[in-house]
Curated annotation (Swiss-Prot):
Belongs to the IspF family. GO terms for molecular function: 2-C-methyl-D-erythritol 2,4-cyclodiphosphate synthase activity; metal ion binding. A divalent metal cation binds at residues 12, 14, 46. Keywords: Isoprene biosynthesis, Lyase, Metal-binding. Its EC number is 4.6.1.12. The gene is ispF. This is 2-C-methyl-D-erythritol 2,4-cyclodiphosphate synthase.
Length: 162
């Protein structure tokens, strides 16, 4: 019997480096550094993908879209998010909601949250109110505090489709 609700958790981190664009939640942000990665390194979308896939017991983003596969080199993470949501829907689930937190000292992300919510909701095909995003710092502690990288955490609630 299919469970009526499933919850998944996702986490991702990428190194900040000069010479890369900074993508966050599908929105390109102006900053002196960007995130390194095989794809566009959008840590927020990657954490959300892992939360969605985990909730549906479909493993993780690296399993479905491995960095060893050249077709994913430089890919727009919004494409990965759309595919992850297709996989979730193929299992008979719809999104209840997402709650995610981004940890970064710079740039300040709060002004960009409404744009990120709109982009993510459009890609996943849900209401903006189904996407909760928060930004925090680590009070200058650890690799995020030293501005060496950015991390993101996400929880997704799935609801059995009727």
């Amino acid at each position: 019997m299919k469970k009526p609700f499933r919850i998944g958790f996702g986490f991702d981190v990428h190194r900040l480096s000069e010479g890369y664009p900074l993508w966050m939640g599908g929105v390109r942000l102006e900053h002196s550094k960007g995130l390194e990665g095989h794809s566009d390194a959008d840590v927020l979308i990657h954490a959300i993908c892992d939360a969605l896939l985990g909730a549906a017991a479909l493993r993780d983003i690296g399993y479905h879209f491995p960095p060893s596969d050249p077709q994913y080199k430089g890919i727009d993470s919004k494409i990965l998010l759309a595919r992850a949501m297709e996989l979730v829907r193929s299992q008979g689930y719809e999104l209840g909601n997402i709650d995610a937190t981004i940890a970064a000292e710079q740039p300040k992300l709060n002004p960009h949250i409404p744009d990120m919510q709109r982009v993510l909701a459009e890609v996943i095909q849900v209401e903006v109110s189904d996407i909760s995003l928060k930004a925090t710092t680590t009070e200058k502690l650890g690799f995020t505090g030293r501005e060496e990288g950015i991390s993101a955490y996400a929880v997704a609630l799935l609801i059995a489709a009727v």
